[in-house]
């Protein structure tokens, strides 16, 4: 079976947070209570290291929270981020991060396929990190009003043992979703880069399952 591949998109000058990104792949929340689980793989371009190439799973509205796989000088990190008043340009905050294990990808071609009429160019060595990401949404009652949605974000290296990513010392922390300016809250994926370069890394979504 195939996978959905999202190449990282160069963000415009003056980019502030995901609220400025035109390339979010989102859908409306299907219910007040649901769980979305995805198996993903991130393959950043090593030539863009330390320049903000990232991808992840986001719950988007006027505020947002996300599980974000980011390529850094220390390797690929999985970050839990939140941003309040995103549409007004607020800065995103990294509240928790853990390192991910990455594996080298096979070299795409060998020297026997190289042209003999031009100087040889060493192929770029890519590494990939796989992860299972989970968004769990639950309603919270409000007196005299409709319930508000709260969300927790979870990570697993194997799809079996899950760990919530939350601010340090705040186990059970839940993000409160806010509707978008014109629509309700949405969830989905993104893959961005801040560097202007022709070649990009990518995110592959093997599958996503939405359950009660």
Indicate residue ranges for each PLM-predicted region:
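Extracellular glycan-recognition regions
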Residues: 1-212
